[in-house]
Amino acid sequence: MGDMANSSIEFHPKPQQQRDVPQAGGFGCTLAELRTLMELRGAEALQKIEEAYGDVSGLCRRLKTSPTEGLADNTNDLEKRRQIYGQNFIPPKQPKTFLQLVWEALQDVTLIILEVAAIVSLGLSFYAPPGEESEACGNVSGGAEDEGEAEAGWIEGAAILLSVICVVLVTAFNDWSKEKQFRGLQSRIEQEQKFTVIRNGQLLQVPVAALVVGDIAQVKYGDLLPADGVLIQANDLKIDESSLTGESDHVRKSADKDPMLLSGTHVMEGSGRMVVTAVGVNSQTGIIFTLLGAGGEEEEKKDKKGKQQDGAMESSQTKAKKQDGAVAMEMQPLKSAEGGEMEEREKKKANAPKKEKSVLQGKLTKLAVQIGKAGLVMSAITVIILVLYFVIETFVVEGRTWLAECTPVYVQYFVKFFIIGVTVLVVAVPEGLPLAVTISLAYSVKKMMKDNNLVRHLDACETMGNATAICSDKTGTLTTNRMTVVQSYLGDTHYKEIPAPSALTPKILDLLVHAISINSAYTTKILPPEKEGALPRQVGNKTECALLGFVLDLKRDFQPVREQIPEDKLYKVYTFNSVRKSMSTVIRMPDGGFRLFSKGASEILLKKCTNILNSNGELRGFRPRDRDDMVRKIIEPMACDGLRTICIAYRDFSAGQEPDWDNENEVVGDLTCIAVVGIEDPVRPEVPEAIRKCQRAGITVRMVTGDNINTARAIAAKCGIIQPGEDFLCLEGKEFNRRIRNEKGEIEQERLDKVWPKLRVLARSSPTDKHTLVKGIIDSTTGEQRQVVAVTGDGTNDGPALKKADVGFAMGIAGTDVAKEASDIILTDDNFTSIVKAVMWGRNVYDSISKFLQFQLTVNVVAVIVAFTGACITQDSPLKAVQMLWVNLIMDTFASLALATEPPTESLLLRKPYGRDKPLISRTMMKNILGHAVYQLAIIFTLLFVGELFFDIDSGRNAPLHSPPSEHYTIIFNTFVMMQLFNEINARKIHGERNVFDGIFSNPIFCTIVLGTFGIQIVIVQFGGKPFSCSPLSTEQWLWCLFVGVGELVWGQVIATIPTSQLKCLKEAGHGPGKDEMTDEELAEGEEEIDHAERELRRGQILWFRGLNRIQTQIRVVKAFRSSLYEGLEKPESKTSIHNFMATPEFLINDYTHNIPLIDDTDVDENEERLRAPPPPSPNQNNNAIDSGIYLTTHVTKSATSSVFSSSPGSPLHSVETSL
């Protein structure tokens, strides 16, 4: 049989090697022997098997297993195997305890500085700078000593320590809940991943962790191999081993050439059967993980940030990051055939920047920079005004000279002014934003699980809210994927229902039963129903299940045929793939000849038919004219009824004329048509309504299918994707390519832009067509807004399109492991309606963040202006240090929790998507922010300057330093908090709706937080005393504060009345970053790709990491210094009490990147290194040409970037290589 792709081993070991040597636990192989064997490849491996075991059957005997029956499924035997050979599981790293996480949080440099600052401020509260009593220094040096000074200083130090404790606890809790959520998600995915094995002669689906050495495993297209093994039998098997070897080409496997299969590799084509020889830490991938894990722990001690040590491990292709902040690990290629050049190329690809899909992150980045700039300008102006005010008053108005002894006092003032400037900057940054984004995404992801959406990449959740187009598969997503044959053409007769067996000639019936039974995957079966009265269970490929069901409907059974001709007796198999669109199987006949059975798409296979069986079962000629008649009279009517048409044919080869089996075109030709069947796959009843919802929501749904154009059009009409009378396009793949390519065969974006807006159905399409369409829509700039595209996929070849899409949906039931790995969200029920729910949740996330932004920016605008004017006019702040701590730390945190957990409503689907370019802060939101800021500032300044007259109380404006808290400033603080509390209710609506209470009781978290905050505020005001700079208020004063707060709701209605369109002066904010703002260095990254979307979003990632994190870190560091410096230099009795305002410890959640990716958590340093890496060289400058290597390039890069999720050492081996 030579080079046959389908090779099976004849089990005849050599006589001298038939003696099985009993070894470990009664088995004939030791663990070390098997590990050594699996390190070999190709001819070397075959030679070793031959020398040591005779052949694969000898190896099976040594392992006490049967190549056809498998293990006996005996619990004791399985347990014994686990003890001797290990279990298919990598021992998990122990989760960190809460105290360990607290200790880690304390290691933060900023917090250490804050801790030191707190201790120093406690010590310095008793320190008096020299020269403060000197008359020569003028009135700046103050007057009488205050007894409460030491106490007040102690309170300031305690306030800083309190803020540190709060930050540490919140950070530790965040990390703990993140780790818990990740482990929960990981274990759920692990339980769902199963693999097919043969035990007791029965095909069983077992969890991958239950695989043992000696199991006989069925390998099929799309599988991710969970263990190492040796092939027993293979049909046209091709494996992608790039994850281990760095070899990008698919490797053909056969029992007589290269039988070694490795865990973590993907089956790209064909099927087969293997005996498992190594599992868990003893498999090739497991050995690498173990080595890396050991190196990782040492490395972790050296470098907490997880930077990778140079050396052997850097030449890796696959990167597997440990989720819990551990070291990023890289797999070293095993014996790569390509040598150093290949290795270098793969390394560059592995280090290439990961595609960042999040539209939201780009907008938040831009907004953060805008806010930062505004804050910087305000703070600079504040410092300049204060310094000028002080210098003019001291040295010009009072005519004093600079004395050496007064220098510490003057320096103290200058430091104080600088601190005020920094405070204005700090107040300007919305610290609660990272937390709001984290909470909103984490909350949504958890809830989306109940809606059958398993989110693998967090940013996909919010990106889905912006989706403008969905490219959906037909089978299983829009349809039920329970297929049945309802029409057939047999023996010159078109049957509209299942024919009676007696109506068919025995020869036709016999040929049909054999063609279907043999030329189908033997793993595909029809099993009895689980419950009485239920439908029979379909296991395996659904189209083949329909054909096997047809055999049963004809009162025949396929199982006896399969027993008569077992799988290892099949001579040659041409497996189905997206290029062939057919499957063919060759068997040897008793007379020494061969018979080929073939099945496939009718219009493709009929072209290869030269004969057809007539009503008597005899051959008659089948000319092109006959074929055209058949297409017109049989196939088109079936297709117009929405049926998939499959042709079943055969061909006989006489004993003397064995063809060249590798010449497929010659072998699968000159066929005789047995039958054409029409298979029905009913539309899911809930799909038409779901598509209507999408269309109302401004989302265009397109169907991309491999089916016949008429079938696709009929199903699209049933679903509501196309409506009668609409101007739309339904194209076949060939026509689509003709329209979008130029004379040279290159894709032109201009041509694509003429096709895709009207395209609704793409039939007879290949995965490349799907990728081309998705890329073309994403890259297009023709419409009013850039498109955000979601794609569904289930096949191995859908990987490139799923990766390219903004959001890739894989099928949880029908999807292959490869498709799941490439996806962002897995639909656990394979249902289109779940995509609509994902849109709803995505829009909800976007709105939640916008709500929080509206609330937070109102607080920030007011606080900045109050701080600025307070410092410049009264040289004091109405809001004291600990009060600011309460507002910034507690209210922002609580508000982010309250606004980020709003449940989604159907009304979210009644508006158009935002798209890529829509700003984060709309003009309506800007109107709300500025409108409420005007109201709040008017109230606060009125209270500040005339409040004491209105309430008939003492003014707090000119109170000496460290004097008891005044009622005046307490009223201002209380009113400020009340206004924020009621404005939080206003912030629930961001599109100008009037009823801000709509659905408020459906969110118990919001109600609890608002009431809880109000309760704590009462405690602070009435019993806070000196630590909170509060004086108890009377009932009347409380009622006035509440009255002003409720005024926010009334004022909100006034603002809603003003039409936004009339306010031309309002600008939107928070657009996505534009190309013109990018640096040359950033533009150089990924230069070979003509992909503006990726370029734009990659820049968002760079800015986010480099910009916001650094700004926030610098702010926190300066703030920490501010607190300690101030306490050291504070003049004891300055009438200008800026002191209380300045030592405001703020709550800042640690870096955005640290908090957001609960699932896809990547270390900042690691990301920065990746982002600075040079772009990978383009394999082919013409990215649009047919041969541009789209698939290979995308796939190779993915293994470096997508294994983030898998790398938790707790995952079983099957998930070592996937993002799952």
Curated annotation (Swiss-Prot):
Q: What is this protein called?
A: Plasma membrane calcium-transporting ATPase 3
Q: Which residues form the active site?
A: D473
Matching NCBIfam families: ATPase-IIB_Ca (TIGR01517), ATPase_P-type (TIGR01494)
* Gene from which the chain derives: ATP2B3
Say which enzyme class the record assigns.
translocase
One GO BP annotation here?
regulation of cytosolic calcium ion concentration
Q: Which reaction does it catalyse?
A: Ca(2+)(in) + ATP + H2O = Ca(2+)(out) + ADP + phosphate + H(+)
**Which organism's genome codes for this protein?**
Homo sapiens
Tell me the domain of life: Eukaryota
Q: Which residues lie on this side of the membrane: Extracellular?
A: 119-155, 385-417, 870-879, 944-961, 1025-1034
Provide the transmembrane region boundaries. Answer: 98-118, 156-176, 365-384, 418-435, 850-869, 880-900, 921-943, 962-983, 1003-1024, 1035-1056
